[in-house]
């Protein structure tokens, strides 16, 4: 799989759904407008980026970045 965010992944895609509060939805919409992506694509890219960069999100919301070799 390519390490490029936004590259077409190898393998089958799955659908998920989640709820966002209005403030986060607004931030997502603003980001999508700035990037030119659809709101759905913006969310996909941001989730992929976050999961690749961070190994854990503790309850205290102090993110622990993954070590990059």
Swiss-Prot record:
It comes from the Bacteria. Keywords: Conjugation, Cytoplasm, DNA-binding, Plasmid. One of its GO terms (molecular function) is DNA binding. Pfam families: TraY (PF05509). GO terms for cellular component: cytoplasm. It is found in: Cytoplasm. Belongs to the TraY family. Part of the relaxosome, a complex composed of plasmid encoded TraI, TraM, TraY and host-encoded IHF bound to the F plasmid origin of transfer (oriT). Conjugative DNA transfer (CDT) is the unidirectional transfer of ssDNA plasmid from a donor to a recipient cell. It is the central mechanism by which antibiotic resistance and virulence factors are propagated in bacterial populations. Part of the relaxosome, which facilitates a site- and strand-specific cut in the origin of transfer by TraI, at the nic site. Relaxosome formation requires binding of IHF and TraY to the oriT region, which then facilitates binding of TraI. This is Relaxosome protein TraY. It comes from Salmonella typhi. The lineage of its organism: Bacteria, Pseudomonadati, Pseudomonadota, Gammaproteobacteria, Enterobacterales.
